[in-house]
């Protein structure tokens, strides 16, 4: 059994929220145990718990445009301390083999994975043209050795971010599936691919 920490920026049930829910519903629970970290309570938390998936509420270290004010930066650094304390306890209990960050907005996953030498998968839904500082920062984060896999929601997103060889070698496009519109065979094939990304090869 491989334990995976999933980190998401929201607890609503919109686009990326539904994508995460669909992925977790179809994950082979005989092989993988998902633990989900959300920033607050909401309908996504309830939907996940209805699938018997453990959900933990904690700061996810969300990056946003108004972060760079003295007040918000102080709050962000406090959240780092709180978030790391919670995830450290979870890691002691579950010994995660992979951390999955759903959207670029959450930084906790890559930060914790880098510090603790854990494999990290970033599911990228966004194209961020401006501010250019954010774009440069994310290119650097996506290039990190600890960020072992990148899943893009479209070819356009993949092309936008593949600015160096380090990023190119990690990426794959998997279209977001919406359960009600996707034939069963296609959904099964989609999640077979996704699950294969989680397989950690023995050293």
Regions found by a protein language model. Give the residues of each.
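An aromatic- and histidine-rich active-site surface loop
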Residues: 98-116, 132
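Carbohydrate-associated surface elements
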Residues: 156, 177
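A short, glycine/small-residue-rich beta-strand->loop->alpha-helix junction that serves as a flexible
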Residues: 7-21, 129
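Conserved nucleotide-sugar phosphate-binding/catalytic loop shared by glycosyltransferases and other
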Residues: 30-71
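Short N-terminal targeting/anchoring amphipathic segment
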Residues: 75, 87-106, 121
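Short amphipathic alpha-helix
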Residues: 16-28, 42-47, 139
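A conserved, positively charged/aromatic
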Residues: 71, 121-151, 166
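A short helix/loop element that forms part of the nucleotide-sugar donor recognition site in Leloir-type
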Residues: 183-201
């Amino acid at each position: 059994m491989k334990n995976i920490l999933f980190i998401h920026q929201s607890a609503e049930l919109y686009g990326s929220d539904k994508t995460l829910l669909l992925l977790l519903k179809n994950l082979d629970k005989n092989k993988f145990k998902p633990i989900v970290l959300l920033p607050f309570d909401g309908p996504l938390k309830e939907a996940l718990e209805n699938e018997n998936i453990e959900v933990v509420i904690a700061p996810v270290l969300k990056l946003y445009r108004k972060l760079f004010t003295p007040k918000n930066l102080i709050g962000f650094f406090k959240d780092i301390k709180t978030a790391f304390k919670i995830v450290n306890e979870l890691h002691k209990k579950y010994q995660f083999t992979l951390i999955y960050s759903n959207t670029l907005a959450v930084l906790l996953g890559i930060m914790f994975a880098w510090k603790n030498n854990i494999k990290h998968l970033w599911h990228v839904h966004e194209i961020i043209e401006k501010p250019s500082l954010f774009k440069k920062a994310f290119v650097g984060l996506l290039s990190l050795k600890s960020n072992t896999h990148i899943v893009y929601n479209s070819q356009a997103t993949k092309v936008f971010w593949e600015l160096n060889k380090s990023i190119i070698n990690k990426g794959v496009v998997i279209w977001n599936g919406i359960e009600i519109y996707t034939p069963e065979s296609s959904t099964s094939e989609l999640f077979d691919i996704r699950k294969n990304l989680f397989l950690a090869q023995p050293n």
